Structures are given as C-alpha cells and as structure tokens.
C-alpha cells in the first residue's frame, strides 16, 4: 500500500469531494420534488426559468458522476500502489467545473451569501489540483 503523505492527502481530498457531491446528488434523487421546487423558487425569476428542470437533472447527474469518479481516485491513492492517478487529475478538474456552475447559478439568482458558501469548496479543489500537479506532474 502507498502511504506517503501526498498520496494520503490526495486520497482524503478525493473522499471529501465524494462525500460532498454524493450526498447532494442522492438528496436530489430522493427528494426530487422538494429540490426541484427549490430550484424553481430560486431561478424562477431569472432567464434560466425555461430550462430549470433540465438544469436540475444536469447538476444531479454531474454530482453523481463526479462523486463516482472521485471514489475511484480515492481508491487509487489509498488502496492501490498508484502514486499518480489520472482519475484524481480529472476528478479535481470536473469538481472545479461543477463548483463553478453552482457558483454561477447562485450569482445569477442573486444569492450572494449562497455563492460565497461555495468559495471554500472551490479553494479546496484548487489546492487539491495544485498538490496533484506538484506531486505527480513534476
């Protein structure tokens, strides 16, 4: 097993995004009606109103996909002999892309407090990508 510090940190950061996106994605699946109603109440007065339902499903699909992708990355770092896992690289990039979409949506809805709550996740993903780049790409 690979227990060097950088692998452990990258594995834990991968698990962080598994938990973050899996919980959110599962919640959207289990409580679809309530979450969709919330999306409609938040974005109903914006230019996104005609496409709220497809956007809701798109975000849900991305959250579930990224959480699965990051689970593979965590496995690579914590349970395999992988010292450099391409799943981690793309996982952090996909996480950042999803977080930027969520941030943009909050800004469009003029929920500035909600948008500011996403910033720590974006910073965490940026730090994780930086660590990955320095550990595996140098």
Task: Describe the residue ranges of each PLM region.
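Solvent-exposed, well-ordered loop and adjacent helix/strand elements within mature globular domains
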Residues: 20-62
């Amino acid at each position: 097993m690979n227990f060097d510090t950088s692998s452990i940190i990258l594995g834990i950061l991968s698990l962080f995004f598994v938990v973050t996106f899996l919980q959110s994605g599962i919640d959207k699946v289990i409580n679809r009606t309530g979450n969709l109603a919330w999306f409609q109440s938040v974005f109903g007065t914006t230019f996104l109103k005609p496409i709220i339902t497809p956007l809701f499903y798109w975000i849900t699909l991305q959250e579930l996909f990224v959480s699965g992708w990051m689970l593979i990355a965590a496995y690579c770092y914590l349970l395999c002999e992988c010292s450099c896992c391409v799943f981690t690289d793309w996982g952090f990039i996909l996480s950042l892309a999803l977080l930027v979409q969520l941030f943009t949506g909050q800004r469009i809805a003029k929920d500035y407090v909600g948008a500011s709550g996403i910033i720590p996740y974006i910073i965490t993903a940026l730090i994780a990508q930086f660590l990955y780049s320095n550990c595996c790409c140098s």
